[in-house]
Amino acid sequence: MRFDVITLFPEFLAQSAGLGVVGRAREKGLFSLHGWNPRDYAEGNYRRVDDRPFGGGPGMVMLIEPLQACLQAIRDADPTPARVIHLSPQGAPLTQAKVRELAALPRMVLLCGRYEGIDERFLEANVDEEISLGDYVLSGGELGAAVIIDAVARLQDGALNDAESAAQDSFEGDLGLLDCPHYSQPAQHPLGDVPEVLRSGNHAAIAAWRRQQSLVRTAQRRPDLLDEQALGKADRKLLDQARQAQKQKASP
């Protein structure tokens, strides 16, 4: 996997991709990261990459020429086809399903805008898709690029010490449920004890408890993710049992 990032702050991406799981994956050679600053491809003494918008209004707009030259340099550096992704609040929301799709690509170019945005002509001519982190606005696309790099890199084969870790994450699995609660030592603590079933050694019971907790959490915290009509009999039974137990606990 190769990431090429067009950004005015390439050092930011290099630093964020050097930490934790992602940093270790990079050291293993599971992906490469290349930052490209459009200012390096701007002409004139001031290396200008922005100008005022036609029609007036606040802010500045990133210019076509430096971006086009930067993108051409990226394509010249490696013949591998690359999907060009613009990080924008106008894009489709980033989901785990999209992350899995991106993780299967050999290469992508992440375009990070700044100021009021990028000249629309450049976007229409070069961008394959736009992705958003959510319905809010950031100072630039770098944080979005860092999120995509992190999410995609950890899915590369060998990135995680235990491959099952990714399979058990929230939004993974057959229904895309939220993850279940996790506990570690000590078993007993003033803040509460670890559920007895997790200490029982009964793997079937533990699996059923974890599945039930995932169902309950998804129903309570992200009901938009749970299609109860699509649940199988076993899942429906687990969810009904949990709801019944909650009602009994709440009753005087």
Swiss-Prot record:
Gene3D superfamilies: 3.40.1280.10, tRNA(m1g37)methyltransferase, domain 2. It catalyses: guanosine(37) in tRNA + S-adenosyl-L-methionine = N(1)-methylguanosine(37) in tRNA + S-adenosyl-L-homocysteine + H(+). Keywords: Cytoplasm, Methyltransferase, S-adenosyl-L-methionine, Transferase, tRNA processing. CDD domains: TrmD-like. S-adenosyl-L-methionine binds at G113, L133, G134, D135, Y136, V137, L138. Its main location: cytoplasm. It is found in: Cytoplasm. Its EC number is 2.1.1.228. Homodimer. Belongs to the RNA methyltransferase TrmD family. This is tRNA (guanine-N(1)-)-methyltransferase. It comes from Stenotrophomonas maltophilia (strain R551-3). The lineage of its organism: Bacteria, Pseudomonadati, Pseudomonadota, Gammaproteobacteria, Lysobacterales. The gene is trmD.
